[in-house]
Amino acid sequence: METMRAQRLQPGVGVGGRGTLRALRPGVTGAPTSAATPPAGPPPAPPPPAPPPPPLLLAGAPGLPLPPGATGSPAVLREAVEAVVRSFAKHTQGYGRAVNVVEALQEFWQMKQSRGADLKNGALVVYEMVPSNSPPYVCYVTLPGGSCFGSFQFCPTKAEARRSAAKIALMNSVFNEHPSRRITDEFIEKSVSEALASFNGNREEADNPNTGIGAFRFMLESNKGKSMLEFQELMTVFQLLHWNGSLKAMRERQCSRQEVLAHYSHRALDDDIRHQMALDWVSREQSVPGALSRELASTERELDEARLAGKELRFHKEKKDILMLAAGQLGNMHSSSC
């Protein structure tokens, strides 16, 4: 019984072979889904997904003490980030020292670990440069919990791109420590009310875990006491499952929303999930040529827009990585068939 339940909760969307393990994997093998091409007639409206979490930091989350104008122009964003970096350096390194923001970010997370933070993969901050032979250079930084940020300025050198990514990541890391960033009863009520207003929902939906907003409330309550960055890391898994069509497939396999939430609330985003989703996009591309390139172009635009706005990027970055993995698998298949 437990084995069958675990199989039904696999993140795949397979069509056909309903009782097989492959049909329950994260991908969407077989006929393409609406993400690849619209059906001939109007598609049935799927049950609403869980509303997204309250926006992080620079998107103006409720209760967050942002520097004045932090959500405004790029110039104001730069000024706000610099102010937070200087403030952090003043309190940790004293006056008169030049700020090495890359070292400061690493020091921040090592300090959190030394104070008892549960960092399952250690306190190492990881940087990734986008390959390029000319400016502007782009760098991404992944924090120990999985949150991702990127250089938000025009960077003429690779070193400057690294510093830019470190600055926005440090700002978010510091702000995430503020009490207003913790999920409390008051925060839950405010977030659910905002979700109801955004989705034109009613109060009964918020109390029903089988609705999207009810599931959102359930997730918030299950993560009470955690910070918003920690919650965003969890939500990334569900965002990817929704994007790939996996949540819809699980509903078709008679998985309850509570089962899905309980299962994936404790499962980290891993290479198995990425690989299975990539296989789905290989299948989509084979069924509808051009589907992969269109999705990749759209994802790259979204990633660049979010990066330049100083937003958390993991969802967009994971989407791009999955699509690039699919493109690589297609290339290997073409090479082997020649």
Swiss-Prot record:
One of its GO terms (cellular component) is cytoplasm. Residues 39-56 have a biased composition (Pro residues). GO terms for biological process: autophagosome maturation. Disulfide bonds: none annotated. Residues 1-65 are annotated as: Disordered. Residues 29-38 have a biased composition (Low complexity). CDD domains: DSRM_SF. Belongs to the LIX1 family. This is LIX1-like protein. The gene is Lix1l.
